[in-house]
Amino acid sequence: MVSALVGRLEARLPRSVYVLQSGVALNAFGNGAANPFVLLYLHDVRGIPLAAAGLASATNAAGGLGASLVGRTISDRIGPKVTVLAGLALATSTFLAYPFVTTAWQAILAGGLLGTAAGGWLTGQSVLLSALVPPARRHIAFAQQRVAANLGLGLGGLCGGLIAATTDPRTFQVLFVLDALTFAGYGVFVARLKAPVANRSVVRGGYRAVVSDRPFLGVLAVDVALVTAAVSLLVGLMPVYARNTVGVREGAIGALFLVNSLLIIAAQLKIARVVEGRRRTRALALTGLLFAACWLLVLTAGHSREYGLMILLAAISAMSFGECIYDAVRSPLVVDLAPDGLAGRYLASAGISWQLGFVIGPATGAALLALWPSALWAGAAAVCLAASAAILRLDTKLPVDARVTPRT
């Protein structure tokens, strides 16, 4: 049923893409059910200080930094399929152990293992998808993957919100086991794929070619800013703020993430079409503006609890459209900037910027949230606005054939 639904999202892609996207949707269901409530579990249920819980989240991302480098190198040399399967196996075993996490050091250890796993399955996933589709269709395939992921995330978030209760630790343990099972299920889908032929004619220089590409480094800097100040805060810290400051219940938090996913499902492929023939830097600048608007609304919700849920709904809507634009542009831009034979290394570097954002965002954000919540959201909005200005300045420095999303 999932395969049929994903297949109807966009025609003219290889069947193997639909198999992969179906696995993505299944895995996203488990992630959507568990991830928004991890910090709430560590802080509100297990009594771990918010700063320490944020450090555990940052350790997750730190574990993914080195794993991303290794995973992409393996993807370039022997193909991405084995890398993805190894990461999924580690994630499955770690989430099966997560119900036994009760202290800060255990949470930090589990976070590091999950980050290492993500360095394999999440970053290798992009290489696998890009190898399964022709270049002119990549932005559609990545947009479709985003839709598939949000189908799972939305339903999972709603399910998690209905199950989770801070008064009963067992409800969170159910979510973690559910997430482990969906990681294992995703592995079954990946195992069905015919592994793409590994590119053994890798361009000499490896990461030296990446660090010498100044326009690409500029794109990565903007990416770090957006992930740090927007994406990393949405799943990790916004639910804690919504519950403890705005006074929103767990079920309503899950419903907010369902709205986030439904909006992305409805708009992602349409936005992927809209950005065709348009400059990618302008699209990313608009992303930053929408992210900033989201956090200013979240800040307002904390000072207007009577209308807090409605304001958060408006905030999550702005974030959703920003995410649609970001996902339609970001990964295809990275692939188009990469020389032949180095797509894996470039995607690895983009994965590092993502992981670095998740190191900085939760660690600093959790500390700010504990001390001065308003400063967190105001500062995040300012960073997003600065990122929008910075990406516009990069436009003329990018290769001509990478500046515009191709038409299909």
PLM feature segments, named:
Residues A67-G79, A266-T281, L369:
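Helix-to-loop junctions at the C-terminal end of transmembrane segments
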Residues V82-L96, A180, R282-L297:
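Structural signature of the two symmetry-related core transmembrane helices
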Residues M1-P14, L193-A225, T408:
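Juxtamembrane intracellular "pre-TM" segments in multi-pass secondary transporters
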Residues R282-Y326:
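C-terminal transmembrane helical hairpin of 12-TM major facilitator-type secondary transporters
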Residues L65-T102:
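Conserved MFS/SLC helix-loop-helix module at the cytosolic interface between two early adjacent transmembrane helices
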Residues G112-A149:
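Cytoplasmic helix-loop-helix junction between adjacent transmembrane helices
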Residues A11-A61, P215-N260:
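Helix-loop boundary and gating motifs at the non-cytosolic
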